[in-house]
Amino acid sequence: MAALSFSPSPPPKENPKENPNPGIKTTLKPFGKITVHNVLSESGANALQQHIANQNTIIRKIRDFGMLGAVQSAAASTTNTTPISSQRKRPLGESQKQNRHNQQNQQLSKTSVPAKKCKTNKKLAVERPPKAGTISHPHKSQSDQSFGTPGRKGLPLPQAVARRNARERNRVKQVNNGFALLREKIPEEVSEAFEAQGAGRGASKKLSKVETLRMAVEYIRSLEKLLGFDFPPLNSQGNSSGSGDDSFMFIKDEFDCLDEHFDDSLSNYEMDEQQTVQQTLSEDMLNPPQASDLLPSLTTLNGLQYIRIPGTNTYQLLTTDLLGDLSHEQKLEETAASGQLSRSPVPQKVVRSPCSSPVSPVASTELLLQTQTCATPLQQQVIKQEYVSTNISSSSNAQTSPQQQQQVQNLGSSPILPAFYDQEPVSFYDNVVLPGFKKEFSDILQQDQPNNTTAGCLSDESMIDAIDWWEAHAPKSNGACTNLSV
C-alpha cells in the first residue's frame, strides 16, 4: 500500500543510479515536494522503502504493465491541469527570453486600452483637420470599437439612435421656422406693444413661443372685431369671439355673402342650372304621377290588342277603324306646325260607343279563352295592314255566300286573325274577308237607335252561328280563365 505524509524539510537529491536493485523497474515523477514511485512487485517496494528513508516519497504498487500505462497517463493529465508551476531551475538565456516575452505582452495590453484624455485635448483633436498622409489601421479601429460604450469618446452611434436623433432635430427645426413665420405675419405695432408689456425684459430679446401664440390670438380677435363678426359665446362665460368649427362656419358664411357680388359668368351659369334642377325636382315631388299614367297605352292579351282610354283605367279593343283614325291623326300631327291639335289617339265617337266590340261580352270572353293557345301572348306591337277601298268592298260583299257572311261576322270581333288563318290563301283574305268585315262593322257603328238596348251588337242568331263556326274551326284549349278588368 502507499503511504502519504508531509514534512517541511526539503526533499533530498535523489539519483536513480543509486538504486541497489537494478532489475526492478521504477519511475520517478517530481510533483512539487512529493515524489511518487511506481513499482511492479511487493518485494521491490519493500527494498525501495528500506533504502529511501524520506517522508515525502509515495510508493505505488502496480500489478501489471497495463495498469502502469494508465497510471502514467493520469499523472501526466494532472500535471498539465494543475496551476502550480514546476520549480525547476532554468538557464540564464531561457529566463531572459521569458522576461522579454512578458514585457511585450504588457506593452500590447497598454496600447489596446485607450487612455483618458482631458477636454482640451479632445477640443484640439476636433479642431485640427486630419492629415492627408495618415493611414488608418484596421486592427486599431477594431480594438477601439471593442472597448467603451457607443456615443462616448468619439465612438459611432447605432443606426436606430442616429435616425431618432435626426428626426428630433428636424421636428425642432420645423417648429422654430413656423414660429418665426408667425412673428413675421404679425404687424410691428402689435409686437412692440407686447414687448413693452414684458417686465424686466430687454427690447432686443426675442419673444418666446408662448408670447408669440398669445400675440397671434389677440391679433386675430382684433381682426374679427374690425370686420364686424359677432360670434356667439361657446360657453357660459360669454367670450367676445369663439374658436373652432363654429367660428370657422361663421367666417365662411360672411365671406360667402361678400363674394356674391363678384360672381363671374361661369358661377352664375352653374347656379342657374342648379336652380332649374331643383325646380324640376320640386315639381315632381309636388305633382306625383297618377296610377293611370303609369299604365301602358297599348297591351296585348290572348292575341287581341287593347288600347287604353286616356285619363281612365279602361281598355278598348283595337279595331280597323281605330287604326285608320290613329294613322290619320298621326299625319295631322306631323303636318301641324302650331302643335295645338288634340294628342288623344282615340276619337270621340269611339269613346261614346256603348260597346267596345260588335260581339257581346260573354261571347267575346269565350272567344278569348278559346284563342289563348293559338294566339301569341303579350305581343306589344300594332299590325298595320292595307285595306281596299269601299267600292271594292261593296261589290265583293254582294258576291259572297251566306256562309262567308257568317265568317265575316265572326271575324268582326277581332282585327287580328288566329294562327290557322295564316294557312289560307291570301286572295281569300284580301278579297272576301276584310272588305265584308269592314263594311258590316262600319254600318253597325253608324246606326243610331236610342230605343234599342242592343245597339252596336250582333243578333242572337248570328252570334250563335259565329260561336258554332268558331268551335268547329278553332283548336280546343284547356287554359284557365283570365280577368280582363284593370
Curated annotation (Swiss-Prot):
Keyword DNA-binding: yes
Region (Disordered): 1-26, 75-158
Tissue and organ expression note: L(1)SC, SC and AC strongly label the presumptive stomatogastric nervous system, while ASE is more prominent in the presumptive procephalic lobe.
All residue ranges annotated as the bHLH domain in the record: 159-223
Polar residues biased stretches: 75-86
Gene Ontology biological-process annotations: central nervous system development; chaeta development; chaeta morphogenesis; epithelial cell proliferation involved in Malpighian tubule morphogenesis; Malpighian tubule tip cell differentiation; negative regulation of mitotic nuclear division; nervous system development; neuroblast fate determination
Gene3D superfamilies registered for this protein in UniProt: Helix-loop-helix DNA-binding domain (4.10.280.10)
InterPro entries associated with the record: bHLH_dom (IPR011598), HLH_DNA-bd_sf (IPR036638), MASH1/Ascl1a-like (IPR015660)
Subunit structure: Efficient DNA binding requires dimerization with another bHLH protein.
Function of the protein: Involved in the determination of the neuronal precursors of optic lobes in the central nervous system.
Protein name in UniProt: Achaete-scute complex protein T8
Species this protein is from: Drosophila melanogaster
Keywords from the named record: Developmental protein, Differentiation, DNA-binding, Neurogenesis
KW Manganese (keyword) present: no
One example GO MF annotation: DNA-binding transcription factor activity, RNA polymerase II-specific
GO cellular component terms given for this protein: nucleus; RNA polymerase II transcription regulator complex
